[in-house]
Amino acid sequence: MKADSYRFDGSGKCRLDKLATNSKADGIDKEKILAKTTENLQKMAALQDAFYADGREGLIFVLQAMDAAGKDSTIKHVMSGLNPQGVQVTSFKQPNSEELKHDFLWRVNKALPARGSIAIFNRSYYEDVLVVQLHDLQKGYQMAPRVLEQD
């Protein structure tokens, strides 16, 4: 995909109805992409087996995007080649009452993968800081003072 064709350069008014949103303009061949995806899924499965056998590290995939950007679909389709026994998916939504009793990284630490395993984070702790401030949850959520500082 050629990202430049979707980038607004700021030289004038931004008219969303005039911006191209269709990848067909880039000459993308869906059949080639599907074939490559199938090939990559097979490679991912083999790599996961080797990663598990090695057992020295854990691996985290972080998917960070706006709502309805396709994070769940990416997990469902792109990660479908992985063995589900070695993968844990965690969605970080607004902190619940239990999570509010701990520091802001507690729930992330809880979701870290074991050695040889893979964790997929739907959103990340970066957004966690933003959500807490946006919804004014700082009083009940233990965050480092430097995180709450404003410029």
Model-derived segments and spans:
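Glycine-rich phosphate-binding loop of ATP-dependent small-molecule kinases
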Residues: 1-151
